[in-house]
Amino acid sequence: EYSSETVPRTLYRVGGVIFSKEKVFSMYENRIMIKYTLEDAHSATTLRFRPFLAFRSVKNLTQANGNVNQSYEEVTNGIKTCMYPGYPELYMQFNKKVKFVYEPYWYNGIEYPKEQERGYPYQEDLYVPGYFEVPIKKGETIIFSAGDSAVATTRLKALYENEVVARTPRTSFFNCLKNSAQQFYFRPKEDDAYLLAGYPWFKVRARDLFVALPGSTLSIDDPVRFEKIMHCLLYTSPSPRDRSVS
């Protein structure tokens, strides 16, 4: 079962086990958090996580190769690893102690049907460094975090809940439009405020920003955001060229 009223949520039934998965991206960090809850179970249950890694541009696919750095380091409740030079470390952590089993392996021939429909390359190989195992009890929640910086694992639950509270629930047509507009807010630095031109190809483009700005702020009762973006464009960019296109 799938729902997305507040955040994407999927309910799974496997035999006598029922568990849910919710996920959110951090608004201001390069981080995804996934929340697993064991809704029902009739016996001892262990969750096993296999992270599939690509370390590539969104515009490209990757293939199995011998250049991968297969090393990793243990961090609080998880590990960090980096497949290739020049990329940031990837921190994978949980809100409770887990066991990591090192088992490097390539999963070949993963397919993306939508890309195939569009006539683009649609098959790639993904690297899996191993797997995490963690026991879970009925009613218990486990939160997984993946990001380019370490996180205080004791705060993961609070961080997740804060992200959920900041979301606009899709309970009306207006709220759906408001939610969509908010997804384009972009803050590369703490004092910055922009609008992205589109996902995944575009970044900040002045013409698109000015066209979309009133509808993405004033029309959803957010004049503060409008003023902050205008101030950022007019006064904080170092040159007229930077104010026009980035």
Regions found by a protein language model. Give the residues of each.
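Conserved small/polar residues in nucleotide/adenosyl-binding loops
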Residues: Y235-D242
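Short alpha-helical segments and helix-capping/turn motifs at coil-helix boundaries
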Residues: S20-E22, R31-K35, Y127-F132, V211-P214
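Acidic/polar, glycine-enriched structural segments that form the non-catalytic walls/loops
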Residues: S26-R31, A41-V204
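Extended ligand-binding groove/face enriched in aromatic
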Residues: S246
